[in-house]
Amino acid sequence: MKFLSKIPLFIFALFFVAPIFASAATTFEVSGWVPYWNGATSTADAIAHITELTEVDPFVYAVQNDGTIKDLGPMDQAPWSTLVATAQANHVRVIPTIMWSNPSAEESVLSTASSRRALEIAAANIAKQYDGVDIDFENKPADLRKYFSLFLQGLYERVGTKLVTCDIEARTPIGDMYPDGNIPAGTGDYANDYTQINKYCDRVHIMTYDQQTVDQALANQAASSSQLYAPVADPQWVSRVVQLTEQSISPKKISVGVPTYGYEYDVTAYSGNQYNYDIMWTFNPKYATQIEQQYNVQPTRNAADELELTYIPTTATTSMPVSSNINNALIAAAAASQYATQLNSHMDFRLLDWPDATSVADKAQLAKQLGVRGIAIFKIDGGEDPNMWSAIQGLASSATTGSLGGGGSISSSSLQRDLSIGMSGSDVAVLQKILNSDSSTQVAASGPGSKGNETTKFGAATKLAVEKFQSKYGIASASNPAYGFVGPATRAKLNAILATL
């Protein structure tokens, strides 16, 4: 911790309390941003579920073009003051976010020593009113790398014992961004210096969402099997991002960003199951429910562990689509693709892709498997899947739900059906038990899914473990559509191992 360097050594020897720091290192944290633009519902949602959080991040402060900070709450008035009081009463940290996303203003303020110091002081004064401060400066030019690091250093030295949290971009491995090897000049030039962030940030929130097409390796893999692929955050991508980040930033500081919103796309289908995606807007899950009802369609869980549905609106508009008379026996994507292929033409349809409670819970389990400190939810405002809270609570307090018991042998017949992400059942628990019998394919090191704590749910961590199993035994690789899917070949090998347990 940064304040230790400010305490004389003899005082430190007298007053150092080891259990506090040991506890902090072993706690899995669940934090969440509470946005100002829905202040009443956001704060009410956070207050109602405050005991399920270890930290709230009121998303209320914004840096202005002149480098001053504006309080958009205001934080000292209801409902924000009520949120703060409730959090403090329940021993939940309050770390307000200071946001900024104006490249020219960031360049002007941060590159000038006097204005940079003034911003450090203003941010530190906010931190001292709470448990710390969260810095969310986005879209900075790469040439601000040195100056932003100087800002973090100055802030870190000014806040005393308070925490400095940094929100940083999700870096996709360059080879996955450009699998064809044609890497544009300047790729890999970032304004955030991860080494300095590791030094001057006590917590680091990785913004692992808004993936879209950044991971071309995964997009190409989906396209090769004619799958729709426009995820908010594919667990495979999240895993790659976190593993890359952990090369520079301590896992004990990292929280994985978890989205609660989705995207609607206007998709054009071309001959041969080829698709072009144009983002229309973001939405909360309630909107998807409305579309389900209007068009009599049902969502399915996709390979990215998110829900998706397709439909063809009667009239293309820039507002919410109206009801359609399309034959609902046809899935819109399949109908559009069939039309485009038969006529060697193209056809448009809509795609909704969004995370639900299962997606959020699986991200938490993945974060545990990756060995990071916790998850950071964006956003808490009453618009998320209402089942999210019980899903998170279940992960935290019901580690033995669906368990096969601690370390005993498996009393079960062989695996009889194909298994994939999103499925559940006692055979999933058997699958996890087999995978956990080998340390190189274990589902999780601790918590739900770990040895002795197997569950009945096939989530992102189970899928990653299946991939490791398939790679180990040469059954499938990342370029194979069956990667992470328990089909006949994988099941045969699993059953052979099961017979020996």
Task: Describe the residue ranges of each PLM region.
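Glycan-recognition patch characteristic of GH18 chitinases/ENGases
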Residues: 25-122
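Substrate-binding surface in catalytic domains of secreted glycosidases
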Residues: 68-78, 140-290
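Acidic, Ser/Thr/Pro/Gly-enriched interdomain connector segments
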Residues: 99, 401-456, 461, 499-501
